[in-house]
Amino acid sequence: MLGVVIVSYRSDDLTVRFVREELAKVTIPHRVVVVANGYDAARAQQLADRIPEAVVLPAENRGFAAGNNLGVKWLDEHDRPAHILLTNNDIHFRSERVVETLVETAVSHPEAGAVGPEIIGPDGNRQGPEPYMSLWDRYVWMYLSTPFLGAEKKRKRFALDYPSRAEAGSHYKLSGAFLLVDAKAFREAGRFDERTFLYGEENILSDRLARIGRKLYFDPSVTVLHDHGQTIGRHHGDRERALMQFDSMACYYRYYRGYSALSIAAARTLYSSILKVK
């Protein structure tokens, strides 16, 4: 039995489409749990009526990490699957046997705590994998260095082409938009850190898995399309979304990478100013 968790936030049509059109292609016996963030029981039941093949859980909107954890805990209590697919609802399969292949890869690489496919955006570019990047590189020097570095030097300095060059194997960070986790490893690692709201979960998961000796494995033999930001883009502007990302990543840098609160506050002030003139 495979577990599948979808965190849905006011995007019923996307969720219904994904369950009926994409997950219907999965040949492995599976149980789908939809965590309906921001819905009460009555509103969640309306969604459940449209996808009777799924379990729909109403939930307070405490973010992506908490929503996924809720779905995973339900699966652990009811089915105890060996693997759980954590997926957005704005995903389209671009290969045959996507999920089946990821499960096979996970089984053949027992060191992997999570396995991800090639994920491309609407522009055709890969969304990961990514290397580690420091707080200041990610949010300050990346932008302030532009007048001083040519395109080629900037590409090398910040490894901007890392996703396009990435080959099959272990990498620091994989996208959480479509990620197969080893249920036991995910549980032992402490699942996602619920202090984050949106963004930063994958970085923290990478560190948590590393602490128990597990890795993230990239399998580009199968591909999915991620219509990135289709949901959040309807509810938040670009600057608001960027600062939301920073605040979640601040949790990662503060508690997992040892940055001081003062350093993070200074970086946020500079980053906020940069966003105003971008």
PLM segments and residue spans:
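Short, flexible, basic/aromatic active-site loop/helix in glycosyltransferases
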Residues: 134-171
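Short beta-strand-to-loop acidic/aromatic patch adjacent to the donor-nucleotide binding site
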Residues: 80-92
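Short, well-formed alpha-helical segments that are part of the catalytic scaffolds
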Residues: 11-26
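A short, conserved alpha-helix in the catalytic core of glycosyltransferases
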Residues: 164-166, 172-223
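A conserved acidic beta->alpha catalytic loop
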Residues: 12, 34-45
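Active-site-adjacent helix/loop segment of glycosyltransferases
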Residues: 206-278
